[in-house]
UniProtKB/Swiss-Prot annotation:
This is Large ribosomal subunit protein bL17. PROSITE patterns: RIBOSOMAL_L17 (PS01167). One of its GO terms (cellular component) is cytosolic large ribosomal subunit. The lineage of its organism: Bacteria, Pseudomonadati, Pseudomonadota, Alphaproteobacteria, Hyphomicrobiales. One of its GO terms (molecular function) is structural constituent of ribosome. It comes from Allorhizobium ampelinum (strain ATCC BAA-846 / DSM 112012 / S4) (Agrobacterium vitis (strain S4)).
């Protein structure tokens, strides 16, 4: 019996699940919106909500706790500088999950998870900078 066993296994080992959630949390903080399957979105929501609360605390111990959880310095910097100040007056409920139909290949239910008051320009900003840099080097060569 699996009474009182909270959380989804998502057909992964514990270490794979932990790494996947760390990567998804870093991506969500960086881009402020990601598309994933509905069960993964429901599992990542409380993790990122706790990270935003750590960012609102803002002290060194909270920063180190966030780094130990998502292991991405740039994402933690954005979390503590931009996102935490944006949600300073909000007590929880930083994310929304919207259903986004079904995936073509396996009919898995998809969802968009995003910050409630997100920065629209943040999505894909890193990719735009990378593409611009590649185009610049191509012109120079």
């Amino acid at each position: 019996m699996r009474h009182q066993k909270a959380g989804r296994k998502l057909n992964r080992t514990a270490s794979h699940r932990k790494a996947m959630f760390a990567n998804m949390a870093a991506s969500l903080i960086t881009h402020e919106q990601i598309v994933t399957t509905l069960p993964k979105a429901k599992e990542i929501r409380p993790i990122v909500e706790r990270l935003v609360t750590l960012g609102k605390r803002g002290d060194l111990h909270a920063r180190r706790q966030a780094i130990s959880q998502i292991r991405d310095q740039d994402a933690v910097r954005k979390l503590f500088d931009a996102i935490a100040t944006r949600y300073a007056s909000r007590n929880g409920g930083y994310l929304r999950i919207m259903k986004a139909g079904f995936r073509q290949g396996d009919n898995a239910p998809l969802a968009v998870i995003e910050f409630v008051e997100r920065d629209v320009d943040a999505k894909g900003a890193a990719d735009k900078a990378r593409v611009a840099a590649e185009a610049e080097t191509a012109e120079a060569a």
